[in-house]
C-alpha cells in the first residue's frame, strides 16, 4: 500500500511552499519529493518543500529544513519561517509556549533552528489568528567584494548574506531579473550559486547629506534553485541592507515584491535585521509517495 503524506500549502507574499510536519510523519527522500511535488503542472505546485520538526538542541523550540524546487537544500527562507510560525501556533493545541497580552492582541515567541542558526519569530495574534510575524534574521554578513573588482558583470551590485548569499543590483528596470537572473545565479564567481535581486528606489531617495527614515523599494527576485519567485524574505532583507550601505535609504524600508510588501528594519542597537510580513494558509491535502 502506498504511503500517504499529509501536507499544508502556505504562502508568504506569494512565495509558496509545501509544509510537512515531520513530528507526525516522515518524508523518506525530501530532495526527490521537492522536485516532484513542486512541479506546477504534474505536482502540487510550489517554490519548494519545507519540513517542520522538533529541535535537536535546547537553544530552539522547533526546526526547519527547506528544499528548493530543484531539490537543493537552502540554508534559510524568511517567508517560510513566517509561515512556520503561523502553522505551529494555529495547528498546535494546547500551545506550549508563553503568550504575552498586548493592547488588543497577543504575542508569542518561537525559537526556530535553521541551517543558518536559530531565528526568533515574534507572532502577532488577534482572536487566535496569527496576523503577522516578525523574524529576527540576525546580523547581515557583508561579502568581500575584492574578488569581484574589475568584473564588468559583478561590479554594479552589493553582496549581502542573510544566512544565504544575495547579490543586489539597483536599477531603473527591475524586469531585467528575467533576462539575467539565471546567468548571474550560476556565474563562476558564485561556486555555490547565488540569489539575485533587482531593486529600484521608489520613494525615500537620499542625498549625500541625509538618509530617508523610511524608503519604499521595488524589488524582483531570482531565487537560487527556484527561479523567479513572488517574494523572498532574505532577499528583502538583503535589499534593505544594500540600500542602507550604499546611501540610498536609511535603516527602515518597505520592500515591494511581486507578491506583496515586507517591512524591513536594520537596527543599530544590535545590528540585527528584522523582517515583518504576513503568512497565509492555502489548503491542506494528502499525496502518495
Where are these regions (language model features)?
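A glycine-rich beta-to-alpha transition motif near the start of alpha/beta enzyme domains, typified by
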Residues: 1-129, 168-289
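Short, charged beta-turn/beta-strand-edge "cap" motif at the junction between a beta-strand
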Residues: 118, 139-140
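Short, solvent-exposed secondary-structure boundary/capping segments
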Residues: 129-137
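C-terminal domain-closing interface element
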Residues: 140-144, 149-153, 158-160, 272-289
Amino acid at each position: 500500500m502506498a504511503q500517504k503524506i499529509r501536507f499544508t500549502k502556505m504562502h508568504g507574499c506569494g512565495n509558496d511552499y509545501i509544509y510537512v510536519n515531520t513530528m507526525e510523519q516522515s518524508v523518506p527522500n525530501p530532495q526527490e519529493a521537492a522536485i516532484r511535488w513542486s512541479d506546477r503542472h504534474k505536482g502540487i505546485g510550489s517554490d519548494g518543500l519545507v519540513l517542520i520538526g522538533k529541535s535537536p538542541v535546547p537553544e530552539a523550540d522547533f526546526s526547519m529544513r527547506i528544499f528548493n524546487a530543484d531539490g537543493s537544500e537552502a540554508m534559510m527562507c524568511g517567508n517560510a519561517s513566517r509561515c512556520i510560525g503561523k502553522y505551529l501556533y494555529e495547528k498546535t493545541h494546547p500551545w506550549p509556549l508563553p503568550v504575552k497580552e498586548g493592547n488588543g492582541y497577543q504575542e508569542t515567541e518561537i525559537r526556530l533552528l535553521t541551517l543558518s542558526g536559530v531565528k526568533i519569530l515574534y507572532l502577532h495574534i488577534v482572536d487566535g489568528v496569527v496576523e503577522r510575524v516578525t523574524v529576527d534574521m540576525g546580523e547581515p554578513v557583508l561579502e568581500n567584494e575584492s574578488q569581484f573588482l574589475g568584473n564588468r558583470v559583478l561590479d554594479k551590485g552589493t553582496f549581502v548574506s542573510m544566512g544565504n548569499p544575495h547579490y543586489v543590483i539597483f536599477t531603473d528596470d527591475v524586469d531585467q531579473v528575467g533576462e539575467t537572473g539565471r546567468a548571474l545565479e550560476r556565474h563562476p564567481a558564485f561556486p555555490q550559486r547565488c540569489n539575485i535581486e533587482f531593486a529600484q528606489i521608489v520613494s525615500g531617495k537620499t542625498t549625500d547629506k541625509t538618509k530617508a527614515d523610511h524608503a519604499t523599494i521595488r524589488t524582483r527576485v531570482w531565487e537560487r534553485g527556484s527561479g523567479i519567485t513572488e517574494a523572498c524574505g532574505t532577499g528583502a532583507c538583503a535589499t534593505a541592507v544594500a540600500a542602507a550601505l550604499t546611501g540610498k535609504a536609511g535603516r527602515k524600508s518597505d520592500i515591494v515584491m511581486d507578491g506583496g510588501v515586507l517591512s524591513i528594519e536594520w537596527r543599530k542597537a544590535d545590528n540585527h535585521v528584522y523582517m515583518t510580513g504576513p503568512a497565509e494558509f492555502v489548503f491542506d491535502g494528502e499525496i502518495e509517495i
